[in-house]
């Protein structure tokens, strides 16, 4: 299959490396970057120095900074840009006149609009071609290393989801299919917020019991919001729900967890993000999720606590105390 990977960040580069290395399918892969300077570095070095300096880009991987060139003969576009760049990328693909199926790998809600990626696609790409989302517990570095992983490809077009999942499936990358786009996207977005909270919990030395409780109650928040938005319960118990949540709340490669650890140490958010050097989607997503929870009348105390730290300057310890001192209630409600 001819695949255009749109975005040469960590996740886009990892997917491109994985697709090129696949022995199960013979893919022709193009990696697109918006930056011509980045392209020049990739071409001259044949490595992505910023993210994966230890992994040479294979000779078969085509590189370009021209969007029309990237999608010209592609049979599938994998859009791997932050949520903030999804709308523009979809709009540019549509403007190219190439009506090719698209899959995105970003996780979060669009800032200001609080829209999930599929809602952005409905506005910018509806009717052009089938589309869907690729999500699940996956650190880009481990995908680049060829370590085993399992993901879910969701599309409202079930046949399309099954066909693309089969194409992306590889010996060490198992890809499942489903039709619950809302559930998959909600799990992938909100888990980043819970991951910040988990980092705060670990950074303050609260131990394994507290972390387990936080992850479990975080899953409850994800499920409440997801069901209200139209997702299915079983999705939140799968790879893109509890699976992704566990990984990002416990793995040392999680950017959002690292933000939480630094907040617990008393560091300022601007300094944390500057040192991180990469986007931590949970920071932006937290605000949109909290706004949605108010609009929909959903109780999300962990999300509220994270936002109080990020936006209101509440010390991490004080926010945790506020959570612990909430009125007792039934676990299931």
Curated annotation (Swiss-Prot):
Keywords: Cytoplasm, Lipid biosynthesis, Lipid metabolism, NAD, NADP, Nucleotide-binding, Oxidoreductase, Phospholipid biosynthesis, Phospholipid metabolism
Protein name as catalogued: Glycerol-3-phosphate dehydrogenase [NAD(P)+]
UniProt similarity note: Belongs to the NAD-dependent glycerol-3-phosphate dehydrogenase family.
EC number annotated for this UniProt entry: 1.1.1.94
Keyword Calcium carried by entry: no
Annotated localization: Cytoplasm
Originating organism: Nitrosospira multiformis (strain ATCC 25196 / NCIMB 11849 / C 71)
Reaction catalyzed: sn-glycerol 3-phosphate + NAD(+) = dihydroxyacetone phosphate + NADH + H(+); sn-glycerol 3-phosphate + NADP(+) = dihydroxyacetone phosphate + NADPH + H(+)
SUPFAM superfamilies, per database record: 6-phosphogluconate dehydrogenase C-terminal domain-like, NAD(P)-binding Rossmann-fold domains
InterPro entries per UniProt: 6-PGluconate_DH-like_C_sf (IPR008927), 6PGD_dom2 (IPR013328), G3P_DH_NAD-dep (IPR006168), G3P_DH_NAD-dep_C (IPR006109), G3P_DH_NAD-dep_N (IPR011128), NAD(P)-bd_dom_sf (IPR036291)
Residues the entry annotates as binding sn-glycerol 3-phosphate: 107, 136, 138, 191, 244, 254-256
Purpose of the protein: Catalyzes the reduction of the glycolytic intermediate dihydroxyacetone phosphate (DHAP) to sn-glycerol 3-phosphate (G3P), the key precursor for phospholipid synthesis.
Residues annotated as the enzyme's active site: 191
Pathway where it operates: Membrane lipid metabolism; glycerophospholipid metabolism
GO MF terms held by the record: glycerol-3-phosphate dehydrogenase [NAD(P)+] activity; NAD binding
Signal peptide interval: none
Binding residues for NADPH: 11, 34, 107, 140, 255, 279, 281
Cellular component, GO, one term: cytosol
Presence of keyword Membrane: no
Pfam families noted in UniProt: NAD_Gly3P_dh_C, NAD_Gly3P_dh_N
Biological process annotations from GO: carbohydrate metabolic process; glycerol-3-phosphate biosynthetic process; glycerol-3-phosphate catabolic process; glycerophospholipid metabolic process; phospholipid biosynthetic process
Domain of life of the native organism: Bacteria
